[in-house]
């Protein structure tokens, strides 16, 4: 099993490169659309890319949510989304192709949700 050595970007790197929301959503959409699903050979690469999107998005959303008041609903929702995304990152790939697709789809849903929070918290 391959492990990811992707590190979260530093604050300086985040300031220099904003998230590419369109690319992140396109990658997520590929797994959430009805057909065609990626082949078993492609699935590992697709899942890795989704994980990388989450690694990039979590610190951004976390930082924006942290600027909101502690009792703000948007802050609580964003933090719940971050927790869910981190939990999904810890899931191991299943033994069957269907289980692997289901895991990747969960990652894709987290990517979409993080994109939503990024846009909503940024005011775009």
Where are these regions (language model features)?
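Short intrinsically disordered terminal tails
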Residues: 1-5, 121-124
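Short, charged, amphipathic alpha-helical segments
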Residues: 44-48, 72-79, 98-105
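Amphipathic alpha-helical binding modules
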Residues: 80-124
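Short terminal alpha-helical segments
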Residues: 2-46
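General structural signal for alpha-helix termini and helix-helix connectors
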Residues: 33-37, 63-70, 87, 91-95
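Short, solvent-exposed, charged loop/turn and helix-capping segments
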Residues: 56-76
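Amphipathic, well-ordered alpha-helical segments in soluble domains
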Residues: 24-27, 53, 57, 81, ...
């Amino acid at each position: 099993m391959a492990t990811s050595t992707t590190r979260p970007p530093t604050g300086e790197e985040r300031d220099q490169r904003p998230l590419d929301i369109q690319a992140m959503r396109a990658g997520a959409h590929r797994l959430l659309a009805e057909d065609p699903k990626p082949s078993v050979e492609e699935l590992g690469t697709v899942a890795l890319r989704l994980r990388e999107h989450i690694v990039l998005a979590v610190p951004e959303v976390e930082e924006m949510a942290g600027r909101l008041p502690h009792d703000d609903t948007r802050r609580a929702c964003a933090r719940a989304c971050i927790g869910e995304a981190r939990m999904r990152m810890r899931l191991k790939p299943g033994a069957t192709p269907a289980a692997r697709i289901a895991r990747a789809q969960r990652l894709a849903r987290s990517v979409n949700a993080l994109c939503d929070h990024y846009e909503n918290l940024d005011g775009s």
